[in-house]
């Protein structure tokens, strides 16, 4: 049967692992159980990776605690993305945003 000239685009997925050593620290990689592009020192500090989820990135506009464009770029360029815990200041801003308040309102 002749080819119809339709190209399937490769969907972008990431596999997210939780650190066994550091709370709220996550490692995103392109393929399940493939840490070949992750530096050895990073893996030592990360501990035993614990599978959190497999996530399609195509069609997604945002992630909860990471910039999706930075994640995609890091996966493409270096093969991994490391998500560190948010700082206390970031947590406050996020909470206030959810509550519909502005940071300036906290001083009233």
UniProtKB/Swiss-Prot annotation:
The record's annotation in SUPFAM superfamilies points to:
YcgL-like (SSF160191)
Q: Which InterPro entries match?
A: YcgL-like_sf, YcgL_dom
Looking at the record, the residues that make up the YcgL domain are 12-96
The protein, known as:
Protein YcgL
Specify the species.
Answer: Shigella dysenteriae serotype 1 (strain Sd197)
